[in-house]
């Protein structure tokens, strides 16, 4: 289920080659849901919506296809080495030697890894503010039928509601995902 990022959109005038290459590779498809009454345009959404196929994780997996991605290890230390970096787990075992390291993790976790190596941007990481977001998943055989596939109410506690079945390549059973508004 797409319980995080619901779709990608591209600003008007964006080069189409990236979108087209993802669609040609079968990792993305256009999605144009029927929006519910009173729905505003979702924040930062353009007119060209794209979803991952068969799930949203297909796009980052495609982007990382030529990278050495390793899972199920908790890296707790970065150590400068002769030719790059050593990545150590919580037992001190070197899990990877790398020329470069890209961190795509929450700021507090990044700060814990970067502070021992003298990273100069710790103040910037400390200034990051998070806002929790509640997500509700509803799946069942007898769910009511709605006249819309997605809605982004402009007021109230809900910021986004979508029928997962409206997305190409998804299970046809109605499965609803509701995300709270930022203010809720």
PLM region spans:
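A structural motif corresponding to the C-terminal end of an alpha-helix
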Residues: 63-70
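Generic structural signal for small/hydrophobic residues in well-ordered secondary structure
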Residues: 8, 63, 102-104, 138, ...
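Short beta-strand to alpha-helix junction loop
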Residues: 10-11, 32-62
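N-terminal FAD cofactor-binding segment of flavoenzymes
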Residues: 1-35
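Central helical "cap/lid" subdomain
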Residues: 95-151
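Active-site substrate-recognition segment that forms the wall
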Residues: 131, 137-184
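Glycine-rich phosphate-binding loop signature in dinucleotide/nucleotide-binding domains
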Residues: 81, 91-97
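A conserved short coil-to-beta-strand element within the FAD-binding core of flavoproteins
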Residues: 71-86
